[in-house]
A protein has these predicted regions:
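Basic, Lys/Arg- and aromatic-enriched nucleic-acid-binding interface segment
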Residues: 4, 8-16, 27, 31, ...
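C-terminal flanking helix
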Residues: 19-22, 26, 254-258
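Proline-centered turn/helix-capping motifs that create local helix->coil transitions or kinks
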Residues: 28-37, 113-116, 156-168
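Conserved tyrosine-mediated DNA breakage-rejoining catalytic core shared by Y-recombinases
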Residues: 41-45, 107-157, 161
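C-terminal catalytic core of Y-nucleophile DNA break-rejoin enzymes
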Residues: 60, 130-154, 171-199
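Short, basic (Lys/Arg/His-rich) helix/loop patches that form interaction surfaces
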Residues: 75-84, 160-168, 172, 182-189, ...
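Short, polar N-cap/turn motifs at the start of nucleic acid-interacting alpha helices
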Residues: 111-118, 230-251
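Catalytic-site neighborhood detector that most strongly recognizes the C-terminal catalytic loop/helix
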Residues: 125, 239-264
């Protein structure tokens, strides 16, 4: 099995199959008990680990220059009406918070206090657009900068006008980001790939941009924050990780978070 771990990137699947066979044998009473279970579980997926370690930095996060280019591209597309204000604000929000896109999708106006400049992350959306707990069931309050506060205030006003056209009243329960889906349903929650698709469309119009995804933005904020001298513990807290071990994967080199990792990165390339 150890040799297989060195040869196959999908070793976890193989390990699971082998364990299932012995569990089944135990169930059918061919063996007294599955003595191999703990032994097998201790064999690490070394091939997969090596592949992850061999990934180039540019495949994992954006440099400051590349990130700046993405912001510029979004600004240009907004000015030329190639994207909607909602899409621009969604991109900004997801980067600044350094959150999971499903958590941005699940934001409701009751979670945003522009007066106190705070956003509470308390839920996410599953692939069926239903609310679920955040990863680890964490509830986190982020302090947000003036730039994001202003964008959210403007978008809230605009959304209220747009919803009124369909006789929908904007309430605190209203989701911050919604759209008209392919079936014509108005005020529908965003589907899982919504932000990915918007970023792809921006990339098509600006082919010079480095490849990026919402998850890569999360890696970028964490890595640039680390390069700016922020401690691993502070980044771990801002990313709502349960420990710094998970955070090390990201940085590659109700908690209240005073400055999200995205803002730290943003401040540095604005200097």
């Amino acid at each position: 099995m150890t040799q297989n771990a060195d040869e196959y990137a999908n070793f976890k699947v193989i390990r699971s199959y082998v364990n299932s066979i012995f569990d089944w044998a135990e169930e059918l009473e061919y063996i007294e008990t599955n003595h191999l279970s703990k032994t097998i579980s201790r064999i690490k997926a070394t091939k997969k680990i090596k592949l992850q370690e061999s990934k180039k930095d540019e495949d994992i996060y954006l440099s400051q220059e590349e990130l700046q280019a993405w912001f510029t591209a979004f600004e240009k597309d907004l000015e030329t009406e190639k994207i909607l204000s909602k899409d621009y604000v969604l991109f900004y929000t997801t980067f600044f918070l350094g959150d999971r896109k499903s958590e941005s999708y699940a934001l409701q106006w009751k979670h945003i206090n522009t007066k106190e400049q705070e956003i509470k992350l308390v839920q996410a959306l599953d692939k069926y657009k239903n609310p679920k707990s955040t990863k680890g069931n964490k509830k986190t309050t982020f302090r947000i900068p003036n730039e994001l506060t202003d964008l959210l205030q403007e978008w809230k006003k605009q959304q209220k006008i747009e919803l009124a056209k369909f006789n929908i009243i904007q309430t605190p329960e209203q989701y911050v980001f919604t759209y008209i889906d392919t079936k014509g349903n108005v005020n529908s929650c965003l589907h899982a790939d919504y932000l990915n698709n918007k970023m792809k469309s921006v990339k098509r119009r600006h082919p010079e941009l480095a490849h990026a995804t919402p998850h890569k933005l999360r890696h970028t904020g964490a890595t640039l924050a680390k390069k700016a001298g922020v401690s691993l513990e502070a980044i771990s807290e801002a990313l709502t990780h349960s420990d710094t071990i998970t955070t090390k994967i990201y940085v590659n080199t109700s908690n209240v978070i005073p400055m999200a990792v995205g803002e730290i990165a943003f401040r540095n390339f604005k200097k």
